[in-house]
Amino acid sequence: MPIIGKLIRKTTALSFKRNAKKGIDYRHQLEALRATIERAKSTKFGFVYSFHAILTKTDVVSQYQKMVPIVDYDEFHEKWLKDSIAGAKDHTWKGRIKYYALSSGTTGSPSKRIPVTTEMIRSFQRVSLRQFSILHELNLPEEFYSASILAVGGSTKLTKKSTHVEGDLSGILKKHTPCPTPMA
């Protein structure tokens, strides 16, 4: 096991250096917004809120804020989400949304369904790896990297509905964990 600890420690060091060079600032957020609008412009939501036109503007953020209204969950659910949940394709996101995370929330509806797209799952996976790479900064001993880890999350029980699967976000993410996590 010591060799595994050494290998993982070295990997976190390399990942940390790469991520530190990238930096996370406004430019990256703007790129993410542009990419999201670009990806969703051919959806019904993108058509109604003129995503094609937003992308032609110099100030995408201001134009997006001007074109897309702020609404509460109940209004968004009624106008957009219920059709996606019913299986509508290209409605709020490209393709059909297969997963919905359940949230009790604090306002409005007693139970909320939050769309979880394939892109979102991949993003969670990338962020998890980046967080892991930050361990390098803690200068932990090699033994740490081969020790057992306790991960705490919500229920991994997912419920299959006619058009989608729903459950706790942690359960959806666990289903898409790229490598098995052995139980000690």
List the predicted regions and their residue ranges:
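Nucleotide 5′-phosphate-binding alpha/beta core
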Residues: 1-102, 108-184
